[in-house]
Amino acid sequence: MAFEKEFHRNLRLTLREKREHLKGAITIWMFEDGRLVGETYGTPLDGKDEIPDGCPKDSHSIYCDSTTILRKYKNKGYGKILKAAFIGRVSQDFRRIYGHARPGASQALNHGFGARLGKTYKNWYGTGEDYRIYDLIIHNR
């Protein structure tokens, strides 16, 4: 649950919630010298799970719930590596990635991979931050 500490309290999942959510997710954990550095996971937008705000029900799309690097390892390029790994993995089965990104590094990271930033969601889940939806078309076919 180390990653939950990186989130605003309103966005944190309990261990039970996270276990249940990850059952239907594609998940990648990143390690450096055996130490956990980052995690990313996404859930298909096929309607089996709740569809996040602004996303379509589309079996060819996936929602990237999180790409998180632990604070100690931030600003070392790990986020870009992990996001690239996620895109590579999901490109086998999906044509588009959706997500909601925080202002700053998260939006820049996704935009850097070619994501189109869309609607702003003010005060996302009471965090005090304005998140933007993004979508990234995967050119794999």
Regions picked out by a protein language model, each given a short descriptive name:
Residues 69, 75-88:
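Conserved acetyl-CoA-binding loop-helix of GNAT-fold acetyltransferases
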Residues 5-33, 47:
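Active-site rim helix/loop that mediates acceptor-substrate recognition in acyltransferases
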Residues 34-38:
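Glycine-rich acetyl-CoA-binding "A-motif" of GNAT/NAT acetyltransferases
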Residues 39-66, 74, 124-128:
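Conserved acyl-donor/pantetheine-binding loop and adjacent beta-alpha core of acyl/acetyltransferases
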